[in-house]
UniProtKB/Swiss-Prot annotation:
Protein's name according to its UniProt entry: tRNA pseudouridine synthase B
UniProt gene name: truB
EC number(s) stated in the UniProt entry for this protein: 5.4.99.25
HAMAP family linked to this entry: TruB_bact
UniProt KW keywords: Isomerase, tRNA processing
Catalytic residues (UniProt): D47
UniProt record similarity statement: Belongs to the pseudouridine synthase TruB family. Type 1 subfamily.
Catalytically driven reaction(s): uridine(55) in tRNA = pseudouridine(55) in tRNA
Matches recorded under InterPro entries: PsdUridine_synth_cat_dom_sf, PsdUridine_synth_N, PUA-like_sf, PUA_sf, tRNA_psdUridine_synth_TruB, tRNA_sdUridine_synth_fam1_C, TruB_C
Lineage: superkingdom: Bacteria
Length: 303
């Protein structure tokens, strides 16, 4: 394993393939150490049970973490009918068990159709959502249950990949804030058989569908120069935003906090990708009335 002598300024995004059994924060800290990065953050937790894509932002890339938090996600998951747990996954205690049930392939397909599109979902008590500053999972472990409001989510894709009458494999594309284990549990409830999630793998975060993920073992075996080559440019996380090219004088002005006049045709309040004349990424701007632009989140190393 290559060790890092001292921390350096590193800016970019790494797509980590998080291992099972590790918290997202532990994975972040291990990777941060491998890169010797001064500043790092992840873009939405994966449960310890889960594996798959965990985008990690280093340095100036932490300024665009929110865009990745808000991005759609795609997963592969396995559910098991007949058993419910208090956590809705295989790490919890069994609270319901039924042996005599029959679910046909057609019934499963028909049930999945009910969960496509815009739906409401009640978050699990075993989640990181907070009640008066305390994470719900801590309250749940103390036997305390808090009423949770159903939240609007969007399931844009829900495909049945395998089903043997007991275990079912799904691919799911969904909006932020979707709890896949609760989706699996809800599907089981609709089928009147109960269900819990046994596996969860995040396939990708929107915007990184075709990018490679790296495991911790792979990164550990690389020299630092090769690790750095794994980083993705910051602006790839915001490719869905409209790009705007600024002149040198406009770059200087917006860095000074001034509003610049740039007839973009963008809708007022729309976020924009800002570049200098040499195609260097400047950061995120926001469209104002009459096409003016103000700074929203600028990166500090752009010239």
């Amino acid at each position: 394993m290559t060790t890092i002598e001292s921390q350096c300024s590193i800016d970019g995004i790494l797509l980590l393939n998080k291992p099972q059994g590790m918290t997202s924060n532990a994975a972040l800290q291990k990777t941060k150490h491998l890169f010797g990065a001064k500043k790092a953050g992840h873009t939405g937790s994966l449960d310890p049970l889960a594996t798959g894509m965990l985008p990690l932002c280093f340095g100036e890339a932490t300024k665009i973490c929110q865009y990745l938090l808000n991005a759609d996600k795609s997963y592969e998951t396995i559910g098991r009918l007949g058993i419910k747990t208090n956590t809705a996954d295989c790490t919890g205690e069994v609270i319901f068990c039924i042996e005599n049930y029959t679910v046909s392939h057609e019934e499963m397909i028909a049930t999945l159709e009910k969960y496509k599109g815009k739906i409401k979902q009640i978050p699990s008590m075993f989640s990181a959502l907070k009640h008066k500053g305390t994470p719900l999972y801590r309250l749940a472990r103390e036997g305390i249950e808090i009423e949770r409001k159903a939240r609007d989510i969007v399931i844009s894709q829900l495909n049945l990949e395998q089903f043997d009458g007991e275990c079912f494999t799904l691919t799911v594309s969904c909006s932020k804030g979707t709890y896949i284990r609760n989706l699996v549990e809800d599907i089981g409830d609709t089928l009147k058989a109960g269900a819990h999630m046994t596996k969860l793998h995040r396939l990708y975060t929107a915007g990184f569908e075709n990018n490679r993920m790296y495991t911790l073992d792979e990164l550990q075996d690389m020299p630092l120069s090769q690790r750095l080559a794994c980083l993705i440019p910051i602006d790839q996380a915001v490719q869905h935003l409209t790009p705007v090219i600024l002149s040198d004088s406009e770059v200087t002005a917006i860095r000074q906090g001034k509003v610049i006049s740039n007839k973009t045709g963008a809708v007022e309040g729309e976020d924009l990708r800002l570049y200098g004349e040499q195609s260097q990424f400047i950061g995120i701007g926001q469209a104002l009335i009459h096409g003016d632009i103000k700074a929203k989140r600028l990166v500090s190393f752009a010239l």
